Design a protein with these regions (language model features):
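Conserved small/polar residues in nucleotide/adenosyl-binding loops
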Residues: 86-88
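Hydrophobic/aromatic residues within well-ordered alpha-helical segments
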Residues: 27-31, 35, 80
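Short, charged helix-capping/linker segments at alpha-helix termini
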Residues: 2-3, 17-25, 36-54
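Short alpha-helix-to-loop micro-motif enriched in aromatics/charged/Gly
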Residues: 64-69
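Structural recognition of an alpha-helix C-terminal capping motif at a helix-to-coil junction
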Residues: 50-57, 70-82
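Intrinsic, short, N-terminal disordered tails of RNA polymerase sigma-factor systems
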Residues: 1-7, 11
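Regular secondary-structure segments
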Residues: 10-17, 56, 60
Length: 88
């Protein structure tokens, strides 16, 4: 059984995929600080912020065809990790 946090993220992702701008704003506010801090472990803070912004924008722009087989949380952190390594 999924926990409340995961269920909330599933609902949030579904809303984003339907084009709900408020849901995307919520996703952005929820994940931006954590993802920036995580990305900053690999690159300078300014670069981490840009990587996170690009990642979240990519989610929005590709929302209609986006398929996430893992959790949203895992997907976002892996995306930032990979983009940070490419940036190095």
């Amino acid at each position: 059984m999924k926990g409340t946090y995961q269920s909330d993220n599933d609902f949030l992702l579904s809303a984003v995929q339907r084009g709900d701008q408020k849901a995307f704003d919520t996703l952005f506010r929820r994940y931006y600080p954590m993802l920036c801090a995580y990305g900053h472990r690999f690159v300078e803070l300014e670069d981490a912020e840009e990587i996170v912004e690009d990642s979240l924008l990519w989610i929005w722009e590709n929302r209609e065809t986006l398929v996430i087989e893992s959790s949203l949380n895992s997907y976002l952190f892996k995306m930032v990790y990979r983009l940070s390594l490419i940036h190095i």
